[in-house]
Amino acid sequence: MLPPYFLFKEMTDTQYIGRFAPSPSGELHFGSLIAALGSYLQARARHGRWLVRIEDIDPPREVPGAAETILRQLEHYGLHWDGDVLWQSQRHHAYREALAWLHEQGLSYYCTCTRARIQSIGGIYDGHCRVLHHGPDNAAVRIRQQHPVTQFTDQLRGIIHADEKLAREDFIIHRRDGLFAYNLAVVVDDHFQGVSEIVRGADLIEPTVRQISLYQLFGWKVPDYIHLPLALNPQGAKLSKQNHAPALPKGDPRPVLIAALQFLGQQAEAHWQDFSVEQILQSAVKNWRLTAVPESAIVNSTFSNASC
């Protein structure tokens, strides 16, 4: 049985569709720009569409005004998206329908296990509540993992093998506190938007096999994946909002754009510094080479908090 019409979307359009999907937990930093720029260039080089989605489904982590700031930052750096911005906070009806369908098909169940219990058995959930028939009160919802995905092909990195225990785990798709889990929301929305290739940071390699397993449960076509190198500070830690990576500069965006292109292994034209933002991006699209992108790189202290 296929998912209901609202969820099932026959993908007849063969146009390339990419996306950038930040969470509004703070302003964009250099690491964020790498993900945005890489996904933008891959989409434009394929003559495709580039969408922006704001993943605002976790209010406790959100910073007031951050979403609007992120959109202004993208525009300031010349990264103009196609169509309307999709806000996950306006998509709860879709996630509820997805949860209902999975429950009706016997593909999910309620779980009352605490984090403390799961940590006490090694951190990987053991399926304790699978046959206990709990109700929804004070419970999370877990996927009933039947056909775990243990590997996938990354268009940049080749075949990536997942940790077997992690791949087989019945992971959470609706949290005990009532919030929708990232893995469910991202799959439902990427399918809804017709995303054909997901270009994002390498820190999201781990959940990819879980997301692919959800695509398969819903009977949807799985998109291609590219995981870009992470921008690291001089200490080898990923640039992130958690380690206080500085926000993108508000001044002339061109030096930062050029640094981001060089980080992605792209060949700099002789007079890039004399180009406008639009000219830099046009040239970058024309000369984009995914095969030149490195696996990882360290950025200089201009873009990282060297004290972290």
Swiss-Prot record:
GO terms for molecular function: ATP binding; glutamate-tRNA ligase activity; zinc ion binding. Catalyzes the tRNA-independent activation of glutamate in presence of ATP and the subsequent transfer of glutamate onto a tRNA(Asp). Glutamate is transferred on the 2-amino-5-(4,5-dihydroxy-2-cyclopenten-1-yl) moiety of the queuosine in the wobble position of the QUC anticodon. Belongs to the class-I aminoacyl-tRNA synthetase family. GluQ subfamily. HAMAP family: Glu_Q_tRNA_synth (MF_01428). Zn(2+) binds at residues 111, 113, 125, 129. A motif ('KMSKS' region) lies at residues 238-242. InterPro entries: Glu-Q_tRNA(Asp)_Synthase, Glu/Gln-tRNA-synth, Glu/Gln-tRNA-synth_Ib_cat-dom, GluQ/Sye, Rossmann-like_a/b/a_fold. A motif ('HIGH' region) lies at residues 22-32. GO terms for biological process: glutamyl-tRNA aminoacylation; tRNA modification. It holds the Pfam family tRNA-synt_1c. The lineage of its organism: Bacteria, Pseudomonadati, Pseudomonadota, Gammaproteobacteria, Enterobacterales. L-glutamate binds at residues 19-23, 55, 182, 200. Binds 1 zinc ion per subunit. One of its GO terms (cellular component) is cytosol. Keywords: Aminoacyl-tRNA synthetase, ATP-binding, Ligase, Metal-binding, Nucleotide-binding, Zinc. SUPFAM superfamilies: Nucleotidylyl transferase. It comes from Escherichia coli O157:H7. NCBIfam families: PRK05710.1-1, PRK05710.1-3, queuosine_YadB. ATP binds at residue 241. The keyword Lipoprotein does not apply. Its cofactor is Zn(2+). It comes from the Bacteria. The gene is gluQ. Its EC number is 6.1.1.-. This is Glutamyl-Q tRNA(Asp) synthetase.
